[in-house]
């Protein structure tokens, strides 16, 4: 984790002003997101990727003036940075989604609901990814600022952004889309069996492209700057440092994948999460080998055979499970098609990051893992990982 330089007491005062009741807030001269009187900014993050972005930006060392506490989906809290009793500024982060879980559905725990009801900032991915957002904010009475890290809340933004913003004026919370925005792509896949319409109008899995991750981090940084304007330069410098790593990650990924002839870059997965990744790196993304996300383990023999025939005709040499899916039917398809099944610890990180200690515990680690395993499975050569990304290098036991 990188160290955040110490915040000034003036910055702490700015954060403290964010904490006050409406009359006191006016006296402070602020009309922005509120926090508690102790100078604590309370944040909630929807996805595992966003939780990691914020963690990478906020984890200072013990000599800093910032105390940072992150509570995971399991309810366990980790402390980073300054001792809470000595810190002049405090940030708490509650992460909703668990590692190795779908990013689309989520049942809020009692503790998570309480955290969201008290939150100043709610960081979300957007593009209609999180189907649970409306129920979460409605049931908790959230009244802070929802920060849409992708810059696009959903399909309604694409249709008529002005009209959507007008509707949001009636909501009890604010919506901040930031200044950066991903270029959303239309959802390319047909409806699942038994459904009349596709699940999405636009692909919500924006983070699979490191370039889009840069957009998300930029908007997160802007929200932090608004929370502590006297420290805008400090937050901006930390965002710049992390973005520099993401750019190196992007360049490294391109170098590794370009070692594979483009006609060999054929990707079948167990979930349709890799559209943006594939577009950026010249991969032919066939989507999920089996379209039924929730019942893949129960695919019929006929369905297995049909899918295997499709895999064989595509020229694919491997099919890849994702960490958030049951790999049982993927294994069956691979066996019938005569190709490699990439599963278990080698599976790709798609909807979510991985558990502590896994390659995909962090966003950068997840991309290093995915690109390394894809490149090796396709017969390419993984380029040397840059020195400042080496701490996130995949384990040697991954795909050979």
Predicted regions, residues:
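Extracytoplasmic metal-acquisition and chelation regions
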Residues: 2-14, 18, 27-400
